[in-house]
């Protein structure tokens, strides 16, 4: 039986995480509005993320089934390593490809660096909402129901057992882990902004589709390495080490962009 104090502590940690995420998203919206001369770039960034996942997840499921199989691989095994490589590579291909598609079509008037930053903020915000904020809110509701027993009302024994397993897992959340999650989300936002600027540069350079595809190799590779290195080394260096590594890779990507940045041309005048 999970104690009331343990449930309350976990609920507090998730509440802290949800509040910090909301603050991060709202702050990003305010900044994007100032930098992007409105919310259109931010909104298109969000669309780019949703589009990337709508295309990536079915493809990832199919590739995983064909290459890896249906069984969950053991951490550290060759199959697990392959699954991490596939997940990281598809994230890079589909997310950077989606950014390029939107920036070269629907958002083709967005050419300033400020608009690129706003676009990256929108991409990161929707990712944070879907993958972190909504699960945190669900965890808060579930832990609250477990504390007063309402979540178990009228449940059959088998379902109650499965629910208890889930609640036991959620009750392990702590302020420390929540803080690490928020820190990771901040660096992920910085990474998304920087990768967007790389893609924006690639789109601005013109040429045909092959030229654009060739230029996208760099942001795809950077995205893949950021994800791949962190997850692959997680079993070896632990969660704290993995977060430090992710932060270091992100800062390296930012430094590389700054070093290679060319003056971005002014947006083309509207017809």
Per-region residue spans from a language model:
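Hydrophobic alpha-helical segments at protein termini of multi-pass membrane proteins
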Residues: 1-271
């Amino acid at each position: 039986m999970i104690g009331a104090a343990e449930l309350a502590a976990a609920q507090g940690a998730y509440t802290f995480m949800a509040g910090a995420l909301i603050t991060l998203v709202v702050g990003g919206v305010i900044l994007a509005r100032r930098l992007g001369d409105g919310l259109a770039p931010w909104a298109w960034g969000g669309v780019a993320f949703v589009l990337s996942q709508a295309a990536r997840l079915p493809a990832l499921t199919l590739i995983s089934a064909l290459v890896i199989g249906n069984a969950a691989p053991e951490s550290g095994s060759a199959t697990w390593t392959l699954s991490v490589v596939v997940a990281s590579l598809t994230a890079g291909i589909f997310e950077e490809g989606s950014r390029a598609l939107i920036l070269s079509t629907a958002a083709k008037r967005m050419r300033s660096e400020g608009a690129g930053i706003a676009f990256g903020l929108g991409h990161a915000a929707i990712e944070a909402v879907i993958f972190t904020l909504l699960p945190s809110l669900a965890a808060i509701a579930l832990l609250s129901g477990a504390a007063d027993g309402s979540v178990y009302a009228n449940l059959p024994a088998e379902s109650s057992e499965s629910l208890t397993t889930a609640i036991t897992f959620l009750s392990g959340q702590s302020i420390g882990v929540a803080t690490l999650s928020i820190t990771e989300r901040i660096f992920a936002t910085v990474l998304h902004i920087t990768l967007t600027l790389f893609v924006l540069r690639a789109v601005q350079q013109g040429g045909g589709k092959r030229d654009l595809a060739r230029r996208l190799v760099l942001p795809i590779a950077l995205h893949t390495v950021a994800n791949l290195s962190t997850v692959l080394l997680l079993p070896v260096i632990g969660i704290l080490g993995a977060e430090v590594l992710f932060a270091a890779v992100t800062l390296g990507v930012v430094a590389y962009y700054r070093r290679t940045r060319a003056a971005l041309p002014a947006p083309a005048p509207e017809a």
